[in-house]
Structures are given as structure tokens and as C-alpha cells.
Amino acid sequence: MELNQVTLPAHDVVASVAFYRSMGFELIVDAHHYARFKSLKGDATFSISACDPVAASSNTVLYFECADLDTQVRALQAIGMQFTQEPKDEPWFWREARLVDPSGNVICLYHAGVHRLNPPWRV
């Protein structure tokens, strides 16, 4: 099996569609209550689905790996994206930056290199 899609809750589908399109994702399904996007690299997809406002305590984090994290963050900041965490080296050997979509879902852009699948503590 291969993980292909994750669906996030969205209390404002229109704003969320605009947000993810501005990040560069390709919109492949667009309905009033649902939208699906394709990654620019590979065939993975993710979607948003209309719901009541997302609880502030949501633990959902959507991760997107970037070959050059700092350049990607600067490009998104140049079009007005606000990050809650600037690129930072983490103790688990990933470099991460975070922002929040219009529905409160946390988006983590990161670069992990070989450590994504092969951290030193891998079982």
C-alpha cells in the first residue's frame, strides 16, 4: 500500500483553496464543499472538506518536504504568507518552518534529507 491522500477540515473552503493554490499546489477537484490538490512533485494528493470551524486544539499537521526549505519559505513570504515558525534546525535532524492555513490547520514545510526515512534511532 502507498499513502496517497489526507483530507483536512476547512471552515472556509474558498479561502483554503486560494491559500493552497498560492502555495503552488495544483487544484484538481473543485466543489463547493470539497477541493483536492496535487503535489507539484510526484502523484500525492491532499484535500480539504467543508466542516464547522476547526477546534483550536486540533493536532493536525500536514508536512511538505522541500529540497531547499529556506528558498521556498522566502518565496512564500514574498507573496505575503505569514509563518508562525521561521526555518529552524530541530533536534531530530529536520529543518522546519510552520504556517497555518485559513482553517487553523498547521502546515510544516521541512527538509529532512536521509533522516526522513533513516533517522539514527530507526528501529
Predicted features by range, described:
Residues T7, K41-D43, D52, S103, ...:
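Short, flexible active-site-adjacent loop segments at beta-strand->alpha-helix junctions, enriched
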